[in-house]
């Protein structure tokens, strides 16, 4: 009977131990942090597809002396462009395009490739089917400067088909927006690579 009493007492003690107020502090693990996605970033978006601003510094060809800055801003499917440039002939008109390759290393800027054209459209003005890189021609004022703003529709700064990482080129002559594939804008007199800001 003594064995039965001892066994009963051991069972009560064991049950009482299980009914304590919780595990000892050494047995508690701290919570493991779980990363959560930022509410404004979709899992399929990249840094570049969310780009809202970009800049290209125009450097001159060996013979032009033209310098400038091109500031791009916007989101969605339109981009605002602000171009400032100096060193041009007063009253001259210049073709202006985004080119396919972000490289202005060659002296004639041919390293920038052809016009940026991810949609494989013909060259043309903004109110007709055109390359994504086709932009309005620019007019230099009487002091040989350009300071102009315009908006491009149907293009983006970032993403696979965005402007960032490509080159912007100012040409010696006006773009006729007719001749294929580039509008006969002449020599490339200034070039800059478009970088996200």
Walk through the language-model features, giving the residues of each:
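N-terminal leader/targeting pre-sequences
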Residues: 19-197
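C-terminal motif of bacterial Sec signal peptides marking the signal peptidase cleavage site
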Residues: 14-17
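Bacterial N-terminal signal peptides that target proteins for export
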Residues: 1-8
């Amino acid at each position: 009977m003594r064995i039965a009493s001892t066994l009963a007492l051991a069972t009560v003690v064991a049950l009482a131990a299980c009914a304590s107020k919780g595990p000892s502090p050494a047995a508690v693990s701290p919570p493991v942090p779980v990363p959560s996605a930022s509410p404004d970033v979709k899992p399929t978006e990249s840094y570049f597809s969310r780009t809202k601003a970009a800049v290209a510094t125009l450097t001159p060809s060996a013979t032009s002396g033209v310098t400038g800055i091109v500031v791009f801003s916007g989101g969605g499917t339109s981009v605002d462009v602000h171009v400032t440039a100096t060193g041009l002939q007063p009253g001259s008109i210049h073709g202006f395009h985004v080119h396919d390759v972000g490289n202005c290393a060659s002296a004639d800027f041919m390293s920038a490739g052809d016009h940026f054209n991810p949609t494989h459209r013909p060259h043309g003005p903004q109110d007709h089917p055109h390359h994504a890189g086709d932009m309005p021609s620019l007019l230099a004022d009487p002091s040989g400067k350009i300071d102009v703003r315009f908006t491009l529709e149907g293009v983006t700064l970032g993403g696979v088909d965005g402007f960032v990482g490509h080159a912007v080129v100012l040409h010696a002559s006006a773009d006729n927006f007719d001749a294929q594939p580039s509008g006969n804008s002449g020599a490339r007199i200034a070039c800059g690579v478009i970088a996200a800001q």
